[in-house]
């Protein structure tokens, strides 16, 4: 029986640079295949992508890669962890969507379009599977630090994370087409 152990690690800028563009490209391809029009994909330290679906729904997407997740989701992982610092995106989402006209202009939307949705996407390292987590589910999830008895003083263990239950009815895991170029 194969036993997988959870591996915590510090933020790694090189890993971010290697993964961020690829993750956005895969998510863009997936969303376009689902009739979303990309309205903004510039790096501006906000959410990663803004889209409008054919239905008229405006959506915003934040994507990251969980490198510890290979081809198979480890059944012992009962939660997806997202850094609590992503709360700033939820706060920005609420703040900006309260003023519809300016929000539409700032996000290259032709007019006030509702409903809005901010979704957090966590992809595996192969970029072919992902968890899709709506902002309201993330916001209601418990916030805790990671427990790791082997490295109790490691700096990354002091960072709080949202702990999202993988069995929550409003999150889902999808297979994605891998984009290699």
Where are these regions (language model features)?
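Mg2+/Mn2+-dependent nuclease catalytic core
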Residues: 69-109
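Short acidic/glycine-enriched loop/turn segments that link adjacent beta-strands
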Residues: 43-47, 127-128
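Non-catalytic C-terminal interaction segments of nucleic acid-processing enzymes
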Residues: 29, 33, 91, 98-117, ...
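Short His-Asn-centered micro-motif
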Residues: 41-43, 63-66, 123-124
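Acidic-basic catalytic patches of nuclease active cores, encompassing PD-(D/E)XK
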Residues: 1-43
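Conserved catalytic cores of phosphodiester-cleaving nucleases, focusing on short active-site segments
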Residues: 31, 49-78
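Short, conserved, surface-exposed binding loops centered on an aromatic residue
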Residues: 40-41, 50, 54-55, 110-112
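Short connector loops at helix/strand junctions that flank enzyme active sites
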Residues: 44-46, 58-62, 113-117
């Amino acid at each position: 029986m194969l036993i997988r152990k959870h591996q915590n690690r510090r933020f790694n800028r090189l890993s971010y640079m290697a993964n961020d563009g690829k993750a956005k490209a895969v998510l863009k391809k997936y969303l376009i295949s689902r009739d979303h029009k990309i309205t903004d994909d510039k790096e501006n330290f906000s959410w990663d992508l803004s889209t409008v679906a054919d239905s008229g729904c405006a959506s915003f997407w934040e994507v990251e890669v969980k490198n510890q997740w290979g081809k198979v989701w480890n059944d012992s992982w009962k939660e997806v962890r997202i850094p609590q610092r992503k709360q700033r995106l939820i706060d920005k989402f609420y703040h900006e969507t309260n003023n519809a006209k300016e929000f539409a202009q700032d996000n290259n939307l032709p007019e006030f379009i509702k409903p809005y949705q901010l979704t957090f996407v966590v992809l595996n390292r192969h970029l072919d599977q992902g968890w899709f987590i709506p902002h309201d589910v993330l916001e209601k999830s418990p916030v805790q630090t990671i427990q790791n008895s082997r490295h109790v003083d490691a700096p990354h263990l002091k960072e709080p994370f949202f702990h999202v239950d993988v069995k929550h009815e409003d999150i889902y895991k999808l297979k994605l087409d891998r984009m290699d170029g």
